[in-house]
């Protein structure tokens, strides 16, 4: 498996773990007996404000939080995202997928630098690898 696929999958799983941790800590569960003795009916209620949810949307990819809410059993109150208005203060907390992508772009750049420093440049000695790495970063940048 390609290392980029593994890295992307690990990042996605880490995001899902963070979302599930936040949901579990914010959700008081009522444990009740289900139809049989071994079944438990988990009914949770999440009371997150719009500000909290909008901040989570800036950190995690679009759709991940909604998916986590939809998979939760029981009653979940899902606030709708804020609508954009003309004021700049409301746009600051509006969900933007570009902010999430930009956060991982820094990690991708770090991975590219790390790989370039580990591999010596072809046809040159190890002393030229730093210069070639900088040239690669200028082309990507």
From Swiss-Prot:
The leader peptide range reads 1-26
- Tissue/organ expression: Neurons.
Which sequence positions carry the modification called Histidine amide?
Answer: 140
According to the UniProt record, where is the region Disordered? 75-94
Task: Identify the main location.
Answer: secreted
An example GO BP is: neuropeptide signaling pathway
UniProt keywords (A-Z) are: Amidation, Cleavage on pair of basic residues, Neuropeptide, Secreted, Signal
Q: Does the keyword Ribonucleoprotein apply?
A: no
The listed locations are: Secreted
Signal keyword on record:
yes
Which Gene Ontology CC terms are recorded? Answer: extracellular region
* Role noted for this protein: Mediates intrinsic neuromodulation.
Protein known as: Neuropeptides CP2
Q: What is the originating organism of this protein?
A: Aplysia californica
Instruction: Please spell out the taxonomic lineage of the organism that makes this protein.
Output: Eukaryota, Metazoa, Spiralia, Lophotrochozoa, Mollusca
